[in-house]
Amino acid sequence: MHKVIRQMSQLRLQAPQGAALLRSADSSSISPAISPVSPPALQSKSLHTAASAGMLCAKWNKYNYGPRKWLEYNKTVHPPQETDEEPRNAYVCHMRSNIKYSPDKMWYIAAFVRGMSVDEALKQLNFVLKKGATDVKETILEAQQIAVERHNVEYKSNLWIAESFVGKGRVFKGVRRHARGRFGKVEYKHCHYFVRLEEGEPPQHYYQEPQTPEQQYESWMEQMRSRKIINSL
């Protein structure tokens, strides 16, 4: 039996090349309509729900365009001004949507640049060691370019940040493998960054101006004198 198997293997090895060519020609002559269909190959060997996976994120986030109302303020048409009125300062609203960053972390950066001039904000953001600082800086630069090209701003350095805030974007929920067959929930958060640049010099106090000691004393005295004794004459 072993001799027969050995002889068959030798005959297979010594077969002429024409037989192989004939076999390949026969296989190529089969029409594609009746050719055997191979099972579709999987695009990825493992399934991961990370937002950076690409395939799943693109499908889930296909029609998520982000907020649209903020950019509509650029289309506002103001009424003409009188000759004795103070000229209205030019402004531009800009945004960046679906940033892969937590809105809670981005809030610190957005609040940091409020009330600064554009040049000062760009300088300060170079030293902010946070991932979201890059997106904020790029958004401010884009808004600065739009203000010069489309909104008749003469000097690009004559702008200050009038508004800077963050909105919550889409949250992708996934799972993470833990030990002993357990799993943990994971949230991949996104955010939207909004900025409004205004022409002119920034104000000295963006927020409410702090009171002087004399003003604090006057407000305290007024508060004390306005007290009322209950059930008195």
From Swiss-Prot:
It is found in: Mitochondrion. Keywords: Mitochondrion, Ribonucleoprotein, Ribosomal protein, Transit peptide. InterPro entries: Ribosomal_uL22, Ribosomal_uL22_bac/org-type, Ribosomal_uL22_sf. GO terms for cellular component: mitochondrial large ribosomal subunit; mitochondrion. SUPFAM superfamilies: Ribosomal protein L22. GO terms for biological process: mitochondrial translation; translation. One of its GO terms (molecular function) is structural constituent of ribosome. Component of the mitochondrial ribosome large subunit (39S) which comprises a 16S rRNA and about 50 distinct proteins. Belongs to the universal ribosomal protein uL22 family. This is Large ribosomal subunit protein uL22m. The lineage of its organism: Eukaryota, Metazoa, Ecdysozoa, Arthropoda, Hexapoda.
